[in-house]
Curated annotation (Swiss-Prot):
Belongs to the pseudomonas-type ThrB family. The keyword Cell membrane does not apply. GO terms for biological process: threonine biosynthetic process. Its EC number is 2.7.1.39. This is Homoserine kinase. The lineage of its organism: Bacteria, Pseudomonadati, Pseudomonadota, Alphaproteobacteria, Hyphomicrobiales. Keywords: Amino-acid biosynthesis, ATP-binding, Kinase, Nucleotide-binding, Threonine biosynthesis, Transferase. GO terms for molecular function: ATP binding; homoserine kinase activity. It comes from Rhizobium johnstonii (strain DSM 114642 / LMG 32736 / 3841) (Rhizobium leguminosarum bv. viciae).
């Protein structure tokens, strides 16, 4: 979450009259994240999250995101729920941006997750994959294998500002992944961004998943690889196999991975590491000065990518083969 667009209090109060949300008591911007402008609202009824959708988010995708939250919530997954306007629509407009009010989810994200938390995340991810079955809308993953080369080309000329010699390495990686990317694996709705700051806990109990604005249709095991990258590396760059084992056991307690998915995990993990390196690189080079947004280091994911290149067997992630 982040703030790119400021809002005037009078405009916000007028916006709230279109909802059964009570009267505004206070609001503040939320700096974490990189995609949309987000605000925490306290009203005379319930706390809410106000999201203004910025230019990177296609307005045509919003029915998918908001409808998915409704679909998952109706099937028992703990996640935020869009608040409908008085006219029944889920989407309004504020400060020249499409805007929505979303229910506030109790909990906090973990700064230092442990293996027991990784197990809960794995289980919740699998529950989401199962609950997503039957969702009628479709959204291709624009940030998967077919989109990476174009994304790299946007940053390639300046990549040397981050680390010298990146051009040859990333070009070679793109060539490898284009040839090795698996097909025919189980697919469905994936979260595609289930980082620690998108999972809330109350104590050690997972209380819900948030931020579905990268959700799309893709390989389910690719979503697993994103979580391994996001949750199972330590700050020094080392892969924590205890966390990896816990996450994979948690996932498979709900939805066992097929042999083909397990075999593909090293390639998928290289791909998901490259995906986040590329988007972080682009944001690092292009985020405007003064934006209330937390930029994230692209080199963290370059190091993870290099780790995955050395993997000889999926067992090295913590799988029992």
């Amino acid at each position: 979450m982040a703030v790119y667009t400021d809002i005037a209090e009078d405009d916000l109060k007028w916006f709230l009259t279109e909802y059964d949300a009570g009267t505004l008591l206070s609001y503040k911007g939320i700096a974490e994240g990189v995609e949309n402008s987000n605000f925490l609202l306290h009203t005379s009824k319930d706390p809410l999250i106000l999201t203004l959708y910025e230019k990177r988010v296609e307005k045509s995708d919003l029915p998918f995101f908001l409808g998915l939250m409704q679909h998952l919530s109706a099937r028992g997954l703990s996640c935020p729920l869009p608040l409908p306007r008085r006219d029944g629509a889920l989407l309004g407009s504020l400060s020249g941006r499409p805007a929505a009010l979303i229910s506030f989810l109790e909990g906090m994200w973990l700064r230092k997750p442990e293996a027991k938390h990784c197990r809960e995340v794995g289980r919740a991810l699998a529950e989401m994959h199962v609950a997503g079955d039957g969702f009628a809308l479709k959204r291709p993953n624009a940030l998967s294998i077919d989109g990476w080369r174009g994304l790299w080309e946007k940053s390639e000329a300046r990549a040397g500002e981050v680390e010298p010699g990146l051009r040859d390495e990333i070009r070679s990686e793109l060539d490898f992944l284009s040839a090795a990317w698996p097909s025919g694996l189980p697919a469905g709705v994936i979260h595609a961004d289930l980082f620690p700051d998108n999972v809330f806990f109350l104590g050690d109990q997972l209380s819900g998943l948030i931020d579905f604005y990268f959700a799309c249709n893709d390989l389910l095991a690719y979503d697993v690889s994103i979580c391994l990258n996001a949750w199972c590396f330590e700050k020094d760059g080392a892969y924590n196999i205890t966390k990896g084992t816990a996450m994979l056991e948690g996932y498979q307690s709900v939805r066992p991975l097929s042999d083909a998915e397990i075999s593909a995990l090293p390639v998928l993990s290289r791909g998901s590491a490259l995906r986040f390196f590329l988007t972080r690189l682009y944001d690092w080079l292009t985020t405007p000065e003064g934006a209330m947004v937390t930029k994230k280091d692209p080199l963290e994911y370059l190091r993870k990518l290099r780790f995955h290149r050395q993997i000889k067997s999926p067992a090295e992630y913590g799988l029992s083969l």
